[in-house]
Amino acid sequence: MIEINRVNKVFYQGERAINALSDINLTIEQGTIFGVIGSSGAGKSTLIRCVNLLERPTSGHIIVDGVDLTQLSNKELSLARRKIGMIFQHFNLLSSRTVFENVALPLELAGASNNAIKEKVDGLLKLVGLSDKNDTYPCNLSGGQKQRVAIARALASDPKVLLCDEATSALDPATTQSILDLLREINRELNLTILLITHEMDVVKGICSQVAIIGDGELVEKGPVGDIFAHPKTELARKFIRSTLDLSIPTDFQARMTPEKVTGSYPLIRLEFTGASVNAPLISQVAREFNIDISILSSDMDYIGGVKFGLMLAELFGTEQAAEQAIAFLRDHKVNVEVLGYVA
């Protein structure tokens, strides 16, 4: 449905070239909810703006529904964009227009009749749960309601693709979840392809079936969400996964922690369990086999894309040799172990 083929985007500040995107290749199938995640400045918003050519790639091709947008004339591109809806972080509603009038705007610009506009807008407002807000102005809506209006407006032209640029970043957690639920419902009912840009792994976890991770303008990893969570190949992927299960080192431990082992100190480790290692009784096995005591400071587990994953902070009490053997045993059983320091 969407092919992003060897896309590069270069911005210039005077004579200085800034590579915002470098050789990006992605294929997004029809009906997929596809997430692109990255930190601020990673290039993800530039990428989504390239998909409908709000930003024209410096090189490469954007193919949507079999049509290479980079080869179209301005008139042809304008027509093609009608099949690509887009919503933004800050809604971009017209304050002087009511909810009904905001949603009707694309239809008015396309020359639809008044009867056709009313029928279409009424149906869209019902779909997004705002049938009772026809005559309300944006200033009297909550953030979540404004985003629902923006979604309805984006769907007015019956697009095949919906682009979401940080669509939940300005919303509180409960409202974010309601918008994600709405997007999932729209995807299911309309078989709509959704490309979603975010810096929040929780959003990807909550709605996406496929994900790509971008860092410094480059594609770092891509694949099914469950596979990325279960088998992250890069530190950037692990960083985003950890952000969904935030296990902070207690303050008193930080004060007593040293980077190197000293007399009377014991290793503080972070364990990342994915796939089969989540269900295996590895902690009890380690304690028995290596005669070591394990003090679990905190742990958390989640389930996504058919895969369990979890994090744990633990302190190992025993001889130095036993601790090293225990860590080696865990790593042999596909547990990622990081020694954070030593606590006296």
From Swiss-Prot:
Q: Which PROSITE patterns match?
A: ABC_TRANSPORTER_1, ABC_TRANSPORTER_2, METN
* Signal peptide location: none
Gene3D superfamilies from the entry? Answer: 3.30.70.260, P-loop containing nucleotide triphosphate hydrolases
- UniProt keyword list: Amino-acid transport, ATP-binding, Cell inner membrane, Cell membrane, Membrane, Nucleotide-binding, Translocase, Transport
- Indicate where this protein is primarily found: membrane
* Pfam families to which the protein is assigned, alphabetical: ABC_tran, NIL
Give the matching SMART domains. Answer: AAA, NIL
Q: Please provide, alphabetically and separated by semicolons, the GO molecular function terms listed in this UniProt record.
A: ABC-type D-methionine transporter activity; ATP binding; ATP hydrolysis activity
Q: Does the keyword Membrane apply?
A: yes
Binding-site list for ATP: 38-45
* Compartments, record wording: Cell inner membrane
Topology of this chain in the membrane: Peripheral membrane protein
EC number(s) per entry: 7.4.2.11
Q: Which family does it belong to?
A: Belongs to the ABC transporter superfamily. Methionine importer (TC 3.A.1.24) family.
**In its UniProt entry, what is this protein called?**
Methionine import ATP-binding protein MetN
